[in-house]
Swiss-Prot record:
This is Deoxyguanosinetriphosphate triphosphohydrolase. Its EC number is 3.1.5.1. dGTPase preferentially hydrolyzes dGTP over the other canonical NTPs. InterPro entries: dGTP_triP_hydro_central_sf, dGTPase, dGTPase-like, dNTPase_1, HD/PDEase_dom, HD_domain. Disulfide bonds: none annotated. It catalyses: dGTP + H2O = 2'-deoxyguanosine + triphosphate + H(+). The gene is dgt. Its cofactor is Mg(2+). GO terms for molecular function: dGTPase activity; magnesium ion binding. CDD domains: HDc.
Length: 505
């Protein structure tokens, strides 16, 4: 029988300069308030203002950015957390589960995990991710790392190519190639808060954004017991020691997830489904009337008291009652959002409570809103309509293709930095400018100080005498480039690409 005690999970210590001694309820809450301040005031949150949700480079302020989306997710996460705590209180289980003095931190961790959940996303969202991964795959050919004979290996980076008689180094080469070809926004988020920005958040707060538990260098299929939790890469080779320590501090078994992350995930699922449809109406991709008919058609036949009738039809009818004095669009989405939240939030909260033993252990291998219920079907309805009528719209597809080209082009522009021999690049890092490398010097100067320092620190910890040194140095050099380009906003990436391609007016 699993003993559920959240005092063992809500760890308020930090990696550096951690508070010591036994803390009162108020003192622990203050520690998490410090986390809130660090997160809300971070540049990574501010950059979300100019990162896309669905429509890249959008000038209409009514259409969501990653920041406005994240604020909405934060509110839904708070709602779910409060609902869970309220239900546990009604059952006199708060003290039993060690939450009687941790309700404030519980809510705060969920809220800030929601606010941070997208900070690692590159410009142009999933198409930015795809561009980064495709560019590196075309050079590193990670699938060839299993090839026999070794001469079949097509990797164009000589020091990462497999070599006869070097099995230990070959295993590292395989890991590095796989890792670099699996850039992922969630894994980059972990790298941002720990390695790049050194936010020194509490262990519990970082645990809240470790959405997937698969390392980026993983090869083959994940175990069936964790196939959902390991659906995508959750962290990179560069953060492996930190994640190992995180698991220890949060009492997490290998490939297990922190309990409050399920709440963040549910809040994101609820928020973006309605928001994407509302943004599509704002962009005139379809009208409210057309959206209603799309939803009606996709759901199919239903009875009067069905969930569809209670949520979608109810919103439609109410919006028309007030249509004389208010915008039908605004009214419809207000009621649709309220109705959706009032149904899905209690369901998510109850699913959390019903599966608390597995969730506490970190092994619940599903999303909270992934079941055979009508609530899950409603969420799928929103997603399917958006997929069919929004994401496949010519304007959206054109912008995504442009975004893909921009990110691919920027990587190609900065490729000379990856082509430099180790000794020359080390000299460039030290002196910042070399006359014999005018192009590389100018490109290096453009990299942000934060990213350069992260590279210098990582390489400085390596033993230069080790045979692994050239491989790992190149790995961190590639990370430097991925960090810089993924940290750009959509607009900055677009402008930088135009400037460097000499297409600016």
């Amino acid at each position: 029988m699993i003993q559920i005690d959240f005092r063992k999970k809500i760890n308020w210590h930090r990696r550096y300069r951690s508070p010591q001694g036994v803390k009162t309820e108020h003192e622990i809450l203050r520690i998490f308030e410090s986390d809130r301040g660090r997160i809300i005031n971070s540049p990574a949150i501010r950059r979300l203002q100019q990162k896309t949700q669905v429509f890249p480079l959008e000038r209409n302020a009514a259409v969501r950015t990653r920041l406005t989306h994240s604020l909405e997710v934060q509110q839904v996460g708070r709602y779910i957390a409060k609902e869970i705590l309220s239900r546990l209180k009604e059952q006199d289980l708060l003290k039993t589960y060690g939450l009687d003095e941790l309700t404030g931190p519980f809510e705060s961790i969920v809220e800030m995990s929601c606010l941070m959940h997208d900070i690692g996303n590159p410009p142009f969202g999933h198409f930015g991710e795809a561009a980064i991964n495709d560019w590196f795959r075309q050079r590193l050919f990670p699938a060839d790392a299993e090839s026999q004979p070794l001469s079949d290996d097509r990797c164009i980076v000589a020091l990462l190519r497999l070599r006869e008689g070097e099995e230990t180094l070959n295993e590292l080469r395989r890991k590095v190639r796989q890792d670099l070809c699996h850039f992922e926004g969630n894994a980059q988020g972990i790298r941002l808060v720990h390695t790049l920005m050194r936010m020194n958040l509490t262990w519990a707060q970082v645990g809240g954004i470790l959405k997937y538990t698969r390392p980026a260098w993983w090869r083959g299929q994940p175990p069936a017991t964790h196939h959902y939790l390991m659906k995508k890469p959750g962290y990179y080779l560069s953060e492996e020691p930190y994640i190992a320590r995180l698991r220890k501090e949060l009492n997490l078994a290998l490939y297990s997830r922190f309990p409050l992350t399920w709440i963040m995930e549910a809040a994101d699922d609820i928020s973006y489904c309605v928001a994407d449809l509302e943004d599509a109406v704002e962009k005139n991709i379809f009208s409210v009337e057309q959206l209603y008919h799309h939803l009606h058609e996709a759901w199919g036949e239903h009875e009067k008291g069905s969930l569809f009738a209670q949520v979608v039809e109810n919103a439609w009818e109410k919006s028309h009652v007030n249509s004389l004095s208010r915008s039908t669009e605004d009214q419809f989405f207000m009621y649709l959002r309220v109705n959706t939240l009032n149904k899905l939030v209690p369901h998510a909260a109850q699913r959390f409570i019903d599966n608390l033993a597995e969730i506490f252990e970190g092994t619940f291998n599903h999303a909270l809103l992934e079941d055979n219920s009508s609530y899950s079907r409603l969420l799928e309805l929103y997603k399917n309509v958006a997929q069919k009528h929004v994401f496949s719209h010519p304007e959206v597809e054109q912008l995504e293709l442009q975004g893909y080209r921009v990110i691919s082009g920027l990587l190609e522009i900065y490729r000379p930095l990856l082509s430099l021999p180790l000794s020359d690049f080390a000299e460039l890092v030290e002196k910042e400018r070399l006359k014999r490398f005018p192009i590389e010097s100018r490109l290096f100067q453009k990299l942000s100080t934060r990213h350069r320092l992260a590279y210098v620190e990582a390489v400085g910890k390596l033993s230069s005498d080790s045979p692994e040194y050239p491989i790992l140095e190149y790995y961190y050099r590639c990370r430097l480039l991925q960090d810089y380009i993924s940290g750009m906003t959509d607009l900055y990436a677009w402008d930088e690409y135009r400037r460097l391609m000499a297409v600016e007016q």
